[in-house]
Amino acid sequence: MDLHFFESIIQQAKPYTKEIACHVLGDPLTQSNLHDYLDIIHKYGMKAMLTTSGYFLKKHSYDTLFHPAVKQINISLNSFNKNDTSLTFDQYMAPVLSLCKAKLDRNEDLFINLRVWNLDEMMSERLFNERLFLTLSSAFDVKLDLDTIYHEKPKSIRLDSKILVHFDNYFEWPSLSNKNYGDGTCQGLQSHIAILASGKVVPCCLDCDGVIELAEGIHVPFS
């Protein structure tokens, strides 16, 4: 989505929301001009939420990542062992931990949410999580006990001021070809909508393929 079209969407959305989630499917940090998009959000007095795999943190300066428009950064740590990468675990975690340290050193007001969405009854990611929890425990002087977390299933644990680690089960993107729909609910059209890069308006971010097209945002006013 080019900047001109993005600004037109933000301008039209202003009467309806105060927050913009800068992704539907994908990683907003792959955009080299992310700062320009954040400038537009800030221009209209809105807040941005960035959700990233963590792989592209080093592509951006802290002036961008801590842009005054950014309300929170969500980092999906479980993406490390679900993607082919030449990075070692330590190389992957280094910019994540550096970001957290810089947030504290600079007294930035945004939230950093570290997501660990890979918990299951079989503890299939036990080895990865054990290493991850040891790393986070050491970095933040907070004990993250693997067995306790699996047993008690906390939603989140505070690591430091506005830095939290969040836990959940595996997330699977919905598909019409999937026979198991599960029991989840969606707040699409109640609390939010999504706009794809093509301009299609859909009920929520789960409809990344535009199956339920409500409007073509390029030609139809947002209202």
Task: Give, region by region, the residue ranges found by the protein language model.
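Short, small/polar residue-rich loop motifs at catalytic or cofactor-binding pockets
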Residues: C186-L189
